[in-house]
Amino acid sequence: MIFDKDDFKAYDADLWNAIAKEEERQQNNIELIASENVVSKAVMAAQGSILTNKYAEGYPGRRYYGGTDVVDVVETLAIERAKEIFGAKFANVQPHSGSQANCAAYMSLIEPGDTVMGMDLASGGHLTHGAPVSFSGQTYNFVSYSVDPKTELLDFDAILKQAQEVKPKLIVAGASAYSQIIDFSKFREIADAVGAKLMVDMAHIAGLVAAGLHPSPVPYAHITTTTTHKTLRGPRGGLILTNDEELAKKINSAIFPGIQGGPLEHVVAAKAVSFKEVLDPAFKEYAANVIKNSKAMADVFLQDPDFRIISGGTENHLFLVDVTKVVENGKVAQNLLDEVNITLNKNSIPYETLSPFKTSGIRIGAAAITAREFGEEESRKVAELIIKTLKNSENEAVLEEVRSAVKELTDAFPLYEE
């Protein structure tokens, strides 16, 4: 039996109510977590489809089970659309997450114990770029590079000098909290100069790359990985791209049977439909508006001397704000904003002095509010509400004013049209 909503509600009221509460939370909150977005109803329909029933170990035309002709069509659609979007010769759409995509990329390029250079977490890198608590830092000998302490920008001369000293087998570029343009051609020059491979994790900026609004790493990286959510606005999952046929074979083997069994074909279907949306000209307009809204919010903070934007501004979908002149730390800021229905996350800043559980900063992203069709005016209003909240944390009357203003915005821009 395939449940409709009424069946579901009657069968498992506890779960139904929990999901309904999350829908209400998303509708009534302003979502600024940079890694989150709002998918289309088509993406949700594909992910909730009957494809969830089908096991399909292997790849199109090379499965270990029968009855896979239809899912072969689904997965091939996703593969071909991904290749078209990013101009890549090969694509693997099976990774369950960006972390698993990164794991498979490492397995395809290097051996355990090899030296790798990745961006320091506080400078904007990701856990899988060598953090000691991650499989990456435990399996490989990661050496971190950082941003310049004064400009808070990537210093390619310093990165080259460091690479010449440590002689890595692999250099990882890409970030989870870096608000400026990344020059992947310079990373490739450095990699070539020291005989290293280059891997790029473009998870955060993939949607901007797809829209032609950020330089693509695909022509320069030996392997490019990404998530399929964030700015790409698809389901939660991973994607691996390469132009090298031999590496493509290694990637496929690393994913299956290396670290995964059967692919989640319902999620692959959701990736396929989201890729079709990315190929629509409207997506480029969306991505352009994401950057405009990010800049609009950042400009409000730049005008207030009590806040400091890391690296001085933004050229993408996110930026970091040092809040320590106004509140104790980023965790306090995050919790205060939760109370007025504005959701974002505490975040370490370059050369952080506080623990990652407290942090000096917060990270603000524009992807989700732009999906709700907030414009630059609304984005500036959101930034003003954040500042108002943090500067009036003990004034309940002011906080109630903020809650009302948030409600006006979320009512005016519903999560989904009925």
Swiss-Prot record:
Give compartment(s): Cytoplasm
Q: Where is this site: Plays an important role in substrate specificity?
A: 229
- MF terms in GO: glycine hydroxymethyltransferase activity; pyridoxal phosphate binding
The answer to keyword Metal-binding applying to this record is: no
Residue list for modification N6-(pyridoxal phosphate)lysine: 230
Q: Which Gene Ontology CC terms are recorded?
A: cytosol
What biological processes does GO assign it? Answer: glycine biosynthetic process from serine; tetrahydrofolate interconversion
**The protein's Enzyme Commission number:** 2.1.2.1
- Carries keyword Amino-acid biosynthesis? yes
Keywords in alphabetical order, please. Answer: Amino-acid biosynthesis, Cytoplasm, One-carbon metabolism, Pyridoxal phosphate, Transferase
Name where it mostly resides.
Answer: cytoplasm
Pathway where it operates = One-carbon metabolism; tetrahydrofolate interconversion; Amino-acid biosynthesis; glycine biosynthesis; glycine from L-serine: step 1/1
Residues that, per the record, bind (6S)-5,6,7,8-tetrahydrofolate: 121, 125-127, 246, 355-357
Name the cofactor(s). Answer: pyridoxal 5'-phosphate
Q: Please list the reactions this protein catalyses.
A: (6R)-5,10-methylene-5,6,7,8-tetrahydrofolate + glycine + H2O = (6S)-5,6,7,8-tetrahydrofolate + L-serine
In UniProt terms, what function does this protein have? Answer: Catalyzes the reversible interconversion of serine and glycine with tetrahydrofolate (THF) serving as the one-carbon carrier. This reaction serves as the major source of one-carbon groups required for the biosynthesis of purines, thymidylate, methionine, and other important biomolecules. Also exhibits THF-independent aldolase activity toward beta-hydroxyamino acids, producing glycine and aldehydes, via a retro-aldol mechanism.
Subunit and interaction comment:
Homodimer.
Family from the record: Belongs to the SHMT family.
Q: What is the name of this protein?
A: Serine hydroxymethyltransferase
Native organism:
Streptococcus pneumoniae (strain 70585)
Q: What is the lineage of its organism?
A: Bacteria, Bacillati, Bacillota, Bacilli, Lactobacillales
